[in-house]
Amino acid sequence: MRSAVLSFSGGLDSTTVLAWLIRKEFKKIHCVNFQYGSKHNVYERIAADAVLKYYASAVPCELTYEVVDLSGAFTGMESSLLLSGGEIPEGHYESSNMSQTVVPARNLVFLSILAGMAWSKGIENIAIGIHRGDHAIYPDCRPEFHKAMDTAIYLGTDRNVNVLAPFLHMSKSQIVQYGIANNAPYHLTRTCYKNQPNPCGKCGSCYERLEAFAENNLIDPVFYEEGANNG
């Protein structure tokens, strides 16, 4: 039985990975939402709950969900993405100022926890939504990191767990294209980095998302704050 533990934020990328796992007929999918002290964690959690509720009665697989509290794990680390950090920068996703949003070793920590969960549950894969657009900014989203972690986790779990990153070499636009074709509920997802009810439409993450929909000649179905490019 194909199975996976998925790092699930409720964002566009992880929701599309969930759609991919369902399309690939994984029979058991355990979604894990990490609450790690980021500015947008509260709204990500709301989105994650909504997406999983949407899928719960509509998919032919065992779909489970867990929230993991890592609120103290990144204490003392510098990142504008964290509640303890400065303002979220605005501008294009690949702009140099977006490096302020790097949370040191975040995916290293997440994947290690997911690997332990998978091994203990007898699940042979863990999945993460890293993609080509992340490579310029986030070192723990690059192909060489994925390759190293896949090897380390495979060996560290006595050859029982693999790391899946199905969109590693895809752009955000290509991810949206795949998700639309596979009925991903993008209207329920949350991408914005800011701590506010409606997405800002101005931070790098929002900018990249809006650009991806535009490149597919689509309007993003989520509502942005006044002054942003509302769908």
Language-model features, listed with the residues they occupy:
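ATP-dependent adenylation/nucleotidyltransferase module used to activate substrates
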Residues: 1-182
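Iron-sulfur (Fe-S) cluster-binding modules
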Residues: 34, 230-231
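Local cysteine-cluster metal-coordination motifs and their immediate loop/turn environment
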Residues: 108, 112, 190-211
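AMP-forming adenylation/ATP pyrophosphatase catalytic core
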Residues: 124, 131, 223-229
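Iron-sulfur (Fe-S) cluster-binding segments and ferredoxin-like electron-carrier domains
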Residues: 137, 198, 204-227
